[in-house]
Curated annotation (Swiss-Prot):
Keyword Isomerase: no
Gene (name only): rpmC
GO biological process, one term: translation
One Gene Ontology MF term: structural constituent of ribosome
PANTHER family assigned: 60S RIBOSOMAL PROTEIN L35/50S RIBOSOMAL PROTEIN L29 (PTHR10916), LARGE RIBOSOMAL SUBUNIT PROTEIN UL29C (PTHR10916:SF0)
HAMAP family attached to this UniProt entry: Ribosomal_uL29
Protein name, UniProt field: Large ribosomal subunit protein uL29
Protein family: Belongs to the universal ribosomal protein uL29 family.
A Pfam family it matches: Ribosomal_L29
């Protein structure tokens, strides 16, 4: 997921994407613990996507606070 795509999302879309990514991260963590994980790079991709979404949410919240 590219930062441009994340910034284009609405707040609801960000929340939905964040929830889906966290669920996938949870599943991958179990696969890794049981030794069934096939694509180890996917875990890092998910972690970075979660960070991107949280960064955009924080930026928007700080902009709202400054605007108030």
């Amino acid at each position: 997921m590219k930062p441009v795509d994340v910034r284009a999302m609405t707040e609801d879309q960000l929340k939905d994407s964040l929830l889906k990514l966290k669920e996938e991260q949870f599943k991958l963590r179990f696969q890794q613990a049981s030794g069934q994980m096939e694509n180890t790079a996917r875990y890092g991709q998910i972690r970075r996507d979660i960070a991107r979404i949280q960064t955009v949410q924080t930026e928007r919240n700080s902009q709202e606070e400054q605007g108030s």
